[in-house]
């Protein structure tokens, strides 16, 4: 079984690659398996990302049919070929469905499952903790990564709760970006050796110094080199360079007007992936069929800004994987 020691570096959050007609509300087979395989192979083979995850918010778990989700799992497992750890997102409205989907991912060959709490009704902290313990018991040989997203899932898991969560040895990681530095230090003191904590790419300075295993990023699908250089700087303890890159990465959210609508927060970046040209994520799925012009404009600005960062921080092949 995968452990926290196996998880570090850059965690790429994958889009659910869409066929050209995948934005139709009557479409039933919208996974572009060919482009998925090409993009995954390029990202792993050329850049040195260390972990791959699917079907989070950016990964569009909320717009897929279960049949499509299964196709995506199968295509991703086949593309990754065990070169890096693969965690399949199975966040759902109820624990039984999440566990059913996670079992399929495990049987298909995924190393772990990425899970947010069931979110239709706001969970209590006690029930959020119990949810992860129940999943760990149901999947004792599968790694569990907590997808901590209070904005979408409407519950913040307090640091102290991880004393109980880490009693389960197969809860091995967390995607997070919602802790103050002091909270993060306390979190790492509790989870050290048991869970790898991945922070947002813009938090690598100073959180890597405080105990983060690495960072998560969906911007890498526009070209991974800025994030690879950031990880390399952190590993080398070149904090001035790390600080500078983090500031540049933070600028990606400031190149256009703040749209102020949560539904476009991840969707605009999928459109930006298409504009950047590193790979083709495809169109947005229904219900995102009416796209405001400001969202389209923002996606173009984001892509142009990111391409400038890729020129500023060119790829140094395999630096991240060999050093992480």
Regions inferred by a protein language model and the residue ranges of each:
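Alpha-helix N-capping/helix-start residues
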Residues: 33, 66, 159, 236-239, ...
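C-terminal alpha-helical cap/extension of soluble enzyme domains
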Residues: 9-19, 42-49, 226-324
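Short secondary-structure transition/capping segments
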Residues: 64-65, 100, 125-128, 158, ...
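Active-site beta->alpha loop and helix N-cap motifs at the rims of alpha/beta catalytic domains
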Residues: 2-154, 288-289, 313-314
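Catalytic alpha/beta core domains of metabolic enzymes, predominantly
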Residues: 137-140, 150-253, 257-261
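A general structural signal for well-ordered alpha-helical segments in protein cores
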Residues: 36, 73, 98, 132, ...
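Glycine-centered loop/turn motif at secondary-structure junctions
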Residues: 47-48, 109, 169, 211, ...
